[in-house]
Amino acid sequence: MNVRFGSPLSRGLRLLDRLSEPATAHAHCDIPCGIYDPHLAQIAAHTVVRMNQLINDLGDAPGPGDKQKNDAWHNSMARYVAVKEEHAELVKKEVRIIWGDYFKPEHLEKYPELHTIVWNIMKLGSKARQTVDMQAAQDLLAEVQKFAEIFWATKGASTQRQPSRQTSGGEIVYPA
């Protein structure tokens, strides 16, 4: 084996690399797998709505006189807030992946409102993390649903809204 030039196999592979132009990879995981779906963003937005419902249903903290009830209330509140924040950030992450890796200039030409929808999702996702605001949570879900409808339209699929059958209520956008 010639150390300077490598094995015949490695020389052959280098030659192939020089003769063929590499293709560009386009996918959220950069493999490319080509798998994109706004469903997870919708479920995460429903979770943000549900956590707001649970926080509102929790009511006011009990007085310091009953340690067990007070501890249980604070435990529940901490868990609801943590899950609300985690899922609001998950909405933003999933939308950023599709926005950055899937959508192309031709999609934006056809759906110029997409910029505003994504911007709204980012702002509402932050607001949902920072506050207990049912309206912000509902608005986040509505914007994610608009995003999902445009996403499926770019794939040539019509959409339908179906009851979510989740405890948060509302609907989920599915490709028809």
Residues of each region from the PLM?
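N-terminal intrinsically disordered, cationic/polar leader segments
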Residues: 2-77, 113-144, 150-170, 174
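Alpha-helical segments in soluble extracytoplasmic regions
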Residues: 66, 70-95
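Alpha-helical scaffold segments in carbohydrate-active enzymes
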Residues: 83-90, 94, 123, 143-146, ...
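Short, solvent-exposed, charged loop/turn and helix-capping segments
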Residues: 94-111
